[in-house]
Design a protein with these regions (language model features):
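Active-site metal-binding core of divalent-cation-utilizing nuclease and nuclease-like domains
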Residues: 296-312, 316-319
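Active-site beta-strand-loop-beta-strand hairpin of nuclease catalytic cores
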Residues: 316-324, 328-334
């Protein structure tokens, strides 16, 4: 099948309300059912589906669904297998394309999860904890960052418990388990188990199945409203369909960014606010492992009265090594995710190359630290004897950051080391100081 034919078929299937059951089956296979696959092996790569692919299918459903259009339950297995095959064929088509634009699309879309769910939620609380940001989110959007962890935990527990209970009860009676109901939390459960603040978070991240989509999806690269609002509110007070828990954790972290962009409270200040927050978060991560010789926001000036040459965002030294972190809050734009070469170049320049070159300038100055007033003032004249490394950090998950850094390294004097805040957090979570420096 051609790419157009695949999209046409997926659009047709997703126009059925019954397609929600296919989404439920996929969610079951890729989460609860994964234990069986790991024990008994997988038939082929097409037996697995990424979270990004499930998001795309859910986005098609909320866009195309006709509520009174259904198919017989006996057809569920056939259509589920067909959807797996269609998505596998679509991926294969992108793998076969040789142009750079589509190769980047393949990297961005099929890269997989960029952080753990608990990281998304934990850093959401930290990213938006500044009073000004916190108040806008809570007062204008009824989104309290202090209850994100408890909300996600309760959602996961509710789904897990009801699936476990239904599997046991239905199996004993040889009854059918609806995959849509399995991932749907009833309104009475929401009211009983969740606090008013937690209910507001759920509501803020919900999309009514009868709602209107602002931007229609034509292909996997298009903006997908489901990613922003991954809790689907089913009609007739049926409940909240939480088919992708991973998407909910990502939305808790990233959807507030879009709200803040739309707010009139910031103007052009949001970028600088995010930059300051990014530096503080990197500093917090570093200080978990290194208690001494850790510095942040150090300006580099030749003399007391001269202009600033550059500045060090975060730095630490350990034994004979020193690490310079340059932190950026630049995100990969939607246009880049669509494969636009000029946009990819621009995003890479602002998020990675600028940070890398700024870091190199810092390293150059630090190798001659005794010549710089500000470094002597901060008792950093000793760093000239260290082996210095330069690392770029992005505040948000940045799809394709490893690939883009690798490709750009060929244009640089020294290799580019770039990662997201979540990657850095994982490294400092898993390893001790000696291992981190090594």
């Amino acid at each position: 099948m051609s790419e157009t034919e695949i999209y046409d078929r997926l659009n047709e299937l997703s126009s059925y309300f019954s397609f929600g059951r296919v989404l439920g089956y996929i969610a079951f296979f890729e989460t609860i059912g994964i234990e069986s696959q790991l024990k008994h092996g997988q038939d082929a790569n097409k037996d697995r589906m990424l979270s990004s692919e499930l998001n795309f299918l859910a986005g098609l459903w909320i866009q195309n669904v006709v509520l009174d259009k259904t198919w017989d339950i006996t057809l569920d297995d056939d259509f589920t297998r067909e959807v797996y095959k269609l998505m596998d064929d679509l991926h294969s088509l992108y793998l076969q394309k040789n142009d750079l634009s589509n190769q980047f699309v393949e990297v961005f879309f099929y890269e997989g999860d960029l952080a753990y769910d608990w990281q998304y939620v934990d850093f959401a609380r930290k990213k938006y904890n500044m009073p000004l940001l916190y108040n806008v989110l809570k007062n204008e959007y009824h989104f309290d960052i202090n209850v994100l962890t408890s909300t996600l935990t309760k959602l996961k527990c509710c789904i897990e418990k009801q699936i476990k209970r239904r599997r046991s009860e239905k199996w004993k009676r040889h009854e059918y388990i609806s995959p849509m109901n399995a991932f749907t939390i009833k309104p009475n459960i929401i009211k009983k188990k969740f606090s008013p603040e937690e209910q507001s978070v759920i509501k803020a991240l919900s999309f009514g199945l009868e709602g209107q989509i602002a931007k229609r999806i034509r292909k996997i690269t298009d903006f997908n409203s489901y990613i922003q609002y991954p809790i689907i509110e089913l009609p007739n007070n049926r409940g909240y369909f939480c088919v992708n828990e991973s998407a909910i954790s990502v939305a808790m972290n990233e959807t507030p960014f879009y709200w803040l962009q739309d707010s009139l409270s910031f103007g052009k200040k949001l970028g600088s606010i995010r930059g300051d927050i990014a530096e503080k978060l990197v500093l917090e991560i570093v200080q978990r492992r290194f208690l001494k010789n850790v510095y942040a926001h150090i300006p580099i000036t030749k003399t007391k009265s001269s202009n600033m040459i550059t500045d060090i965002d975060v730095f630490f030294s350990y034994k004979n090594a020193g690490i310079v972190f340059q932190v950026k809050s630049k995100r990969l734009t939607e246009l880049s995710k669509e494969g636009d070469a000029a946009s990819i170049e621009n995003d890479t320049e602002k998020a990675i190359i600028d940070a890398h070159e700024q870091g190199l300038k810092c390293v150059e100055c630090m190798l001659n630290s005794t010549e710089y007033y500000s470094l002597r003032k901060h008792v950093l004249d000793y760093v000239k004897s260290l082996t210095l490394y330069n690392v770029c950090i992005t505040l948000d998950a940045f799809p394709g950051i490893s690939t883009l850094s690798y490709l750009k390294t060929y244009q640089q004097i020294s290799p580019i080391i770039a990662m997201s805040l979540y990657d850095l957090d994982s490294i400092f979570y898993l390893f001790q100081p000696e291992q981190i420096v090594d």
